């Protein structure tokens, strides 16, 4: 049931290892790259809760989650074929929007799929298997341009403004693998029917399990909070414009205002007798389980760190360890290829560590296991500024890989044990908000931090990311795992 993640992660690995390279090749400046990357988090912010809500209510001959697997796979594969042929930065950015939207359509139901199909006792192992496939696919996906250059003699350089052939062919192969892997999952697994799901989850007796059967909210409170958020967002927007702050901050100001409008709309719709759709999504978001709220803070700081790596890994490694920022130079492209190797190492480590996580969780707890993973990852990121020899950076990547394994396994195993099965999809989608919000914050602020705090030295963004991950580890200590596999 997790085999489709091979395809999903091929898409992510190619994107994470090569997108900044593509943007720089097409003429984007370093401090503009975070804003171009904003497609990934915004797509997830919008699409995952909607797809989760819809898939919770879908049942046809393909099943509940599978129709979304198929749609997302077709669109993502097409985007992978088109993206490396982008003639300009803005075409590449548009393809990134399409790719990320499509990946989210596939990925969100696939996480809920594991929650649907496995018992509490099996969920840590189930998400660990997903982590293995994610790591294994990322190793090959990240290495593809390097393999094509060094094994098949496909050039990794091109004329100014053109994408190297090795990168193009890597994306073509990735598109084929994406659709093939997802189709394998679709045709080799059988989903449980709604009736079977009900029978499997008769143990749910707490309030959360019955939440939504009779939705009730206080419109006055929603009107009040909605107005506060709307006004705060508008004031923030005015300040950004008046003081000519970085335009990426509009992402934050608009987001605050729009969420306020959603609160107002939910209150209005509820008064008219509508309790589904937007009303239910906003209600569920405002009334999420306590454990989910605790995990949200951990996830915010963890993904801020990971997004620092995704955005600045190429510029940090090429400038600090290979001594150049010129995308046309051989040293730059060698450094960019080495970043692909580094990405493959941390994903490879994650794939191997995934097998140890269920054992560690049984010996200690899921919370303790994840705390250890985050501390090791934070120190690994910070060490990128200490090691000068590029080969020693693989040690740093081993640490990051351990954190990556925990990040992809433990929060989802804990979450799927504390949310009602009828809302597995929508809550998995909502949890993604706490993955993408830090990415939006990063995209809105990292360009400012790079120039104002670090004088353009992107290696320091790796240190900042490491500090953020250590903070996440401290916050994880306070998470209460309410699942039956908690101990």
Can you say where each PLM-predicted feature lies in the sequence?
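Intracellular juxtamembrane helix-capping segments at the cytosolic ends
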Residues: 105-118, 406-420
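C-terminal transmembrane helical hairpin of 12-TM major facilitator-type secondary transporters
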Residues: 361, 367-410
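Intracellular loop-helix junctions on the cytosolic face of multi-pass helical membrane proteins
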Residues: 87-90, 106, 120-307, 475-487
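Loop-to-transmembrane helix entry/capping segments in MFS-fold secondary transporters
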Residues: 30-31, 120-130, 336, 419-431
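Helix-to-loop junctions at the C-terminal end of transmembrane segments
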Residues: 46-62, 352-366, 450
């Amino acid at each position: 049931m997790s085999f489709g993640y091979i395809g999903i992660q091929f898409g992510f690995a190619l994107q994470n290892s090569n997108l900044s390279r593509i943007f720089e090749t097409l003429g984007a400046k370093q401090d503009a790259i975070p804003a171009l990357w904003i497609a990934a988090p915004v797509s997830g912010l919008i699409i995952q809760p909607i797809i989760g809500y819809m898939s919770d209510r879908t049942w046809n001959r393909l099943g509940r989650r599978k129709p979304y697997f198929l749609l997302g796979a077709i669109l993502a594969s097409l985007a992978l074929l088109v993206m490396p042929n982008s003639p300009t930065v803005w075409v590449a950015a548009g393809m990134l929007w399409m790719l990320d939207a499509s990946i989210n359509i596939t990925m969100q139901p696939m996480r809920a799929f594991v929650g649907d199909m496995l018992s509490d006792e099996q969920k840590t192992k189930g998400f660990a298997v997903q982590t293995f496939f994610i790591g294994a696919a990322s190793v090959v996906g990240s290495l593809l341009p390097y393999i094509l250059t060094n094994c098949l003699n496909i050039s990794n350089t091109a004329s100014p403004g053109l994408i190297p052939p090795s990168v193009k062919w890597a994306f073509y192969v990735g598109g084929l693998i994406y659709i093939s892997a997802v189709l394998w999952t679709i045709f080799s697994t059988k989903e449980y029917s709604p009736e079977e799901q009900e029978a499997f989850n008769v143990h749910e007796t707490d309030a959360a399990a019955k939440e939504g059967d009779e939705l009730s909210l206080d419109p006055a409170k929603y009107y009040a909070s909605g107005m506060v958020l709307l006004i705060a967002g508008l004031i923030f927007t005015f300040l950004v414009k008046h003081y000519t702050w970085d335009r990426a901050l509009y992402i934050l100001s608009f987001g605050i205002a729009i969420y306020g409008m959603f609160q107002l709309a939910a209150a209005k719709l509820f008064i008219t007798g509508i309790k589904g759709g937007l009303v239910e999504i906003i209600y569920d978001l405002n009334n999420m389980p306590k454990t989910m709220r605790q995990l949200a803070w951990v996830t915010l700081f963890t993904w801020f760190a990971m997004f620092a790596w995704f955005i600045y890994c190429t510029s940090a490694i090429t400038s600090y360890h290979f001594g150049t920022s010129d995308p046309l130079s051989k040293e730059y492209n060698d450094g960019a290829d080495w970043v692909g190797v580094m990405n493959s190492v941390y994903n490879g480590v994650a794939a191997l560590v995934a097998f140890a996580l269920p054992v560690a969780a049984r010996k200690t707890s899921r919370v303790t296991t994840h705390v250890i993973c985050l501390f090791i990852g934070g120190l690994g990121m910070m060490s990128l500024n200490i090691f000068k020899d590029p080969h020693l950076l693989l040690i740093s990547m081993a640490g990051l890989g351990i954190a990556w394994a925990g990040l992809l396994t433990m929060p989802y195993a804990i979450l799927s044990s504390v949310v009602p099965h009828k809302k597995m999809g929508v809550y998995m989608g909502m949890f993604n908000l706490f993955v993408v919000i830090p990415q939006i914050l990063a995209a809105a602020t990292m360009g400012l931090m790079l120039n104002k705090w670090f004088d353009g030295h992107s290696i320091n963004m790796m240190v900042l990311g490491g500090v953020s991950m250590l903070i996440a580890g401290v916050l994880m200590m306070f998470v209460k795992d309410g699942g039956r596999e908690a101990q």
